[in-house]
Swiss-Prot record:
It comes from the Eukaryota. InterPro entries: Stress-induced_KGG_rpt (IPR019626), Stress/Virulence-Domain (IPR052590). Residues 49-58 have a biased composition (Low complexity). This is Conidiation-specific protein 10. The keyword Metal-binding does not apply. One of its GO terms (biological process) is conidium formation. Belongs to the con-10 family. PANTHER family: CONIDIATION-SPECIFIC PROTEIN 10 (EUROFUNG), PTHR36569. The gene is con-10.
Length: 86
């Protein structure tokens, strides 16, 4: 293995050059088939027409829990904090 000091096998620097080249030669090809893009166009339209309504959702819009989650998310985003109340 390469001398990176990191033995994580997911790190390309730790893999043999030939293996990395084989992976790279696949480019952006998906590692699996399926998902929205491979669906029948009619099925795609059916799902898309629901516009997120099929999502179970975590919060009732405007609820205190939703506001709290939004505050926490904003703090975790690494913003400047200029608009923070605290």
């Amino acid at each position: 293995m390469a001398g990176t000091g990191n033995d994580n096998p997911g790190n390309f620097a730790n893999r043999p050059k030939e293996e990395v080249q084989a992976i790279a030669s696949k480019g952006g090809q998906a590692s699996h088939s399926g998902g929205f893009a491979s669906m029948d166009p009619e099925k795609q339209r059916e799902i898309a027409s629901k516009g997120g309504k099929a999502s179970s959702g975590s919060f009732e819009p405007g609820s205190e829990k939703a506001r709290e989650a939004g505050r926490k998310g904003g703090k975790a985003s690494g913003g400047t904090g200029a608009d923070d109340d605290e």
